[in-house]
Amino acid sequence: MRIKKSDFITSAVKKNQYPIDNRVEVAFVGRSNVGKSSLINSLTNRKKLAKVSQTPGKTRLVNFFLINDDFYLVDLPGYGYAKVSKAEKDSWGKTVEMYLTGREQLKRVVLLVDSRHKPTGDDIIMHEWIKHFGYDVIVVATKSDKLTRNELKKNEKVIKETLKLNSDDKLYFFSSLNKDGKDELIDNLFLEFATDLD
């Protein structure tokens, strides 16, 4: 499928601010500065659809983007940034938890990890939490252009072992810089929810 149209619709903190048109939602979650905004911009061919912040932990809202007038891509606040207060961390945690708990429109959660590093304790908890609530989860390892082919192979093994991925679990490597595998990634993330398959 092709992403021909992408529009920012709304930012939300509370449930009553979420869209109410019952379209399917695919949520993106990951550590602060894992490259979430860059990935969203890359997939949609929009340089500034999702704001790329140089300051980790800046995205504190749940952001809804309408794709092809068909389904929502949902950008969740990043977690795991050390240099914020406990109150702010708790607030972000509640925002994410509120969205992920009992959201019927949410059909898939895409967990982003940094391909250069072993997944963190926060990544492991988030992966287990997503699976516990029964959501379909796909892991995308970002910034893969920074690794050699040998390093990619080695790190793929580390990511799979750390997150305890089985043979059915999906893991994709992606670089927002060179966009290798972009079409395949779009199909794997969104195709089954799209009504316009062009």
Curated annotation (Swiss-Prot):
Q: What are the EngB-type G domain coordinates in residue numbering?
A: 22-195
Quote the SUPFAM superfamilies the UniProt record gives: P-loop containing nucleoside triphosphate hydrolases (SSF52540)
What does the record give as cofactor?
Mg(2+)
**Matching InterPro entries:** G_ENGB_dom (IPR030393), GTP-bd (IPR006073), GTP-bd_ribosome_bio_YsxC (IPR019987), P-loop_NTPase (IPR027417)
Q: Which residues bind Mg(2+)?
A: 37, 59
Secretion signal span: none
The function of this protein is: Necessary for normal cell division and for the maintenance of normal septation.
User: How is this protein named in the record?
Assistant: Probable GTP-binding protein EngB
Q: What is the lineage of its organism?
A: Bacteria, Bacillati, Bacillota, Clostridia, Eubacteriales
